Amino acid sequence: MDNKLRIDYLSNHIDYKVVQHKDMYHFNTDTCLLGEFINIKKNDTVLDVGTHNGALLVYIIKKGWIATGIEINAKALEICKLTLKENNINATLIDGDFTSYNFKSKFDCIVSNPPYFTFKDKQTNKNENKNIARHENSLTIESLCKALKQNLKENGVIYLIYKANRINELEKELNNNSLYINELQYVYSKVKPNPKSVLVKASFNNNGKIMQDNKYI
């Protein structure tokens, strides 16, 4: 194996392996929280948007769901292939842009840990691979929500993790595309008073109620 590659394990799952490249974006706590948050029927079709090194795909496939991953960064997709091989699992992988790709069919579930830093939030990294994963240069909140609407089945569900202080922006864009938040889980660090991230479940179902909970890590 390339000396810039290493194998890590997803939290609480010693059999969930992820290949990571020294110079590319690594999975983090958000990835693990989202993987555990997803709850759908066995054999549902799931699309992982921005699949990167395949960490979320491992959760999805190991739980018995039929997975497709789309990734705009070809280098990251090659790492994802190695992750699948290490776990002896299979998925359909697409080298493409979620906002413009023409899928053959819609999905029961779409999941994503999208880039949620704007260029105003934080100085961008000189590493272009990390910029693609972290900053809204190729996948804005507006384009994400529009594509979610286009590719989700009528009774489908969306699972996301997003920056907590941008939840109002996310909700607005979801609503603009006839999508509605059904559940929120704010993620708190035990040493900080304000939540950093929020887990989001959304769908076309607008029942006027949002289940809300807090998670402490």
Regions found by a protein language model. Name each.
Residues K17, S138-P195:
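Conserved Class I SAM-dependent methyltransferase catalytic core
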Residues L33, K62-K63, E78, T83-N87, ...:
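SAM-dependent transferase fold signal centered on methyltransferase-like domains
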Residues Y25-F27, H52-N53, K192-P193:
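Short glycine/threonine-rich catalytic loop with a Thr-x-Gly-x-Asp
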Residues E36-F103, C109-Q123:
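Conserved SAM/SAH cofactor-binding pocket of Class I
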Residues P114-S143:
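Mobile active-site "lid"/loop adjacent to the S-adenosyl-L-methionine
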Residues V191-I217:
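Flexible, glycine-/basic-rich loop-and-beta segments that form/coincide
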Residues L34, N113, L144, A202:
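Residue-level signal for inorganic ion chemistry
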Residues D2-K41:
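S-adenosyl-L-methionine
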